[in-house]
């Protein structure tokens, strides 16, 4: 049955949003530790509020210099985001920074360092030695909506957020401040995006800026129109798009002064904008022994290669783990009726082409590197501005041969 006039919405936030400040701090600390000790075990959570940053969690590492320098890492990242003055509501140079970090639980470390397969079953394969750092389920998704194989609503929302930051940092709109959000509502017919219905852009700004005469026309011209011109989507009608800029009428107080922020509170923004399911685990501040992060990246890698290989127009992949075990306990693949081959065959060949044990994921995606701070804002998937290993299409030929 034809389905017409359905509206689907996704949102993004800028790097100056309080929750994203926390993600950025947590991932900057992670990167600093991995740069000196690639085997660091890291689980760092951050809270920001007016004039204060609190960094807590568990870390086991030999990176003594990076560990001792966490306070400076925090300050540098806040300043890089753009909070460098009390006039903006937050200043990385003068805010209070409190560190409360302990060591990783030895009970967890035991299961990661010596997996059930090695400890109980006597497995000899080195990749069977590393167990999952926790139980859990992770999803990956890909679709042919965009060249980056992401759902169009979240892809467009991220482009708008990145552009909002770009015009602030390069001086095109110097009166903007770091905090901001975007939201995109798109009309779909039979799962095809046909019309951009509404765009909401809320951005922090200097106190003396007029909403109607300055901010709204500037955002339309320098942000929305620029992004839409670059998008050039084949089926999307943008001729009657409604733009709402700062619908409250004013957005001067922002950042940690406006709202407290926490690591891991933007997991839908980080992934597929609500278009695909989510296992519930956040990414930022976690080293790749945590399958919340590494397995979610692997599932995106699997899904994107399936779609790129022409085996389905869109696909969602789920994997599940037990803490302390290397082999997944479950794998589920949904093609939503778009598969070009028997879906059972796809589910059969995925474990043959992709080794989904945590140690193998870390090896194949080269995850023991300081690459995570760049993922803290604007999404972890489908990025067009940075190269990420889980976005590579290096398994397409293997999938075609296996099928």
From Swiss-Prot:
<comment type="similarity">
    <text>Belongs to the AdoMet synthase family.</text>
</comment>
<dbReference type="Pfam" id="PF02773">
    <property type="entry name" value="S-AdoMet_synt_C"/>
</dbReference>
<feature type="binding site" description="in other chain">
    <location>
        <begin position="179"/>
        <end position="181"/>
    </location>
    <ligand>
        <name>ATP</name>
    </ligand>
</feature>
<feature type="binding site">
    <location>
        <position position="286"/>
    </location>
    <ligand>
        <name>ATP</name>
    </ligand>
</feature>
<dbReference type="GO" id="GO:0006730">
    <property type="term" value="P:one-carbon metabolic process"/>
</dbReference>
<dbReference type="GO" id="GO:0006556">
    <property type="term" value="P:S-adenosylmethionine biosynthetic process"/>
</dbReference>
<feature type="binding site" description="in other chain">
    <location>
        <position position="17"/>
    </location>
    <ligand>
        <name>ATP</name>
    </ligand>
</feature>
<keyword id="KW-0547">Nucleotide-binding</keyword>
<comment type="pathway">
    <text>Amino-acid biosynthesis; S-adenosyl-L-methionine biosynthesis; S-adenosyl-L-methionine from L-methionine: step 1/1.</text>
</comment>
<keyword id="KW-0479">Metal-binding</keyword>
<keyword id="KW-0067">ATP-binding</keyword>
<feature type="binding site" description="in other chain">
    <location>
        <position position="290"/>
    </location>
    <ligand>
        <name>L-methionine</name>
    </ligand>
</feature>
<feature type="binding site">
    <location>
        <position position="19"/>
    </location>
    <ligand>
        <name>Mg(2+)</name>
    </ligand>
</feature>
<feature type="binding site" description="in other chain">
    <location>
        <position position="58"/>
    </location>
    <ligand>
        <name>L-methionine</name>
    </ligand>
</feature>
<feature type="binding site">
    <location>
        <position position="282"/>
    </location>
    <ligand>
        <name>ATP</name>
    </ligand>
</feature>
<feature type="binding site">
    <location>
        <position position="259"/>
    </location>
    <ligand>
        <name>ATP</name>
    </ligand>
</feature>
<dbReference type="GO" id="GO:0000287">
    <property type="term" value="F:magnesium ion binding"/>
</dbReference>
<keyword id="KW-0554">One-carbon metabolism</keyword>
<dbReference type="GO" id="GO:0005737">
    <property type="term" value="C:cytoplasm"/>
</dbReference>
<dbReference type="InterPro" id="IPR022629">
    <property type="entry name" value="S-AdoMet_synt_central"/>
</dbReference>
<feature type="binding site" description="in other chain">
    <location>
        <position position="104"/>
    </location>
    <ligand>
        <name>L-methionine</name>
    </ligand>
</feature>
<feature type="region of interest" description="Flexible loop">
    <location>
        <begin position="104"/>
        <end position="114"/>
    </location>
</feature>
<comment type="subunit">
    <text>Homotetramer; dimer of dimers.</text>
</comment>
<dbReference type="InterPro" id="IPR022636">
    <property type="entry name" value="S-AdoMet_synthetase_sfam"/>
</dbReference>
<dbReference type="GO" id="GO:0004478">
    <property type="term" value="F:methionine adenosyltransferase activity"/>
</dbReference>
<feature type="binding site" description="in other chain">
    <location>
        <begin position="265"/>
        <end position="266"/>
    </location>
    <ligand>
        <name>ATP</name>
    </ligand>
</feature>
<protein>
    <recommendedName>
        <fullName>S-adenosylmethionine synthase</fullName>
        <ecNumber>2.5.1.6</ecNumber>
    </recommendedName>
</protein>
<keyword id="KW-0808">Transferase</keyword>
<dbReference type="InterPro" id="IPR022631">
    <property type="entry name" value="ADOMET_SYNTHASE_CS"/>
</dbReference>
<dbReference type="Pfam" id="PF02772">
    <property type="entry name" value="S-AdoMet_synt_M"/>
</dbReference>
<dbReference type="InterPro" id="IPR022630">
    <property type="entry name" value="S-AdoMet_synt_C"/>
</dbReference>
<keyword id="KW-0460">Magnesium</keyword>
<feature type="binding site">
    <location>
        <position position="45"/>
    </location>
    <ligand>
        <name>K(+)</name>
    </ligand>
</feature>
<keyword id="KW-0963">Cytoplasm</keyword>
<dbReference type="Pfam" id="PF00438">
    <property type="entry name" value="S-AdoMet_synt_N"/>
</dbReference>
<keyword id="KW-0630">Potassium</keyword>
<dbReference type="InterPro" id="IPR002133">
    <property type="entry name" value="S-AdoMet_synthetase"/>
</dbReference>
<dbReference type="GO" id="GO:0005524">
    <property type="term" value="F:ATP binding"/>
</dbReference>
<dbReference type="InterPro" id="IPR022628">
    <property type="entry name" value="S-AdoMet_synt_N"/>
</dbReference>
<feature type="binding site" description="in other chain">
    <location>
        <begin position="250"/>
        <end position="251"/>
    </location>
    <ligand>
        <name>ATP</name>
    </ligand>
</feature>
<feature type="binding site">
    <location>
        <position position="259"/>
    </location>
    <ligand>
        <name>L-methionine</name>
    </ligand>
</feature>
<comment type="function">
    <text>Catalyzes the formation of S-adenosylmethionine (AdoMet) from methionine and ATP. The overall synthetic reaction is composed of two sequential steps, AdoMet formation and the subsequent tripolyphosphate hydrolysis which occurs prior to release of AdoMet from the enzyme.</text>
</comment>
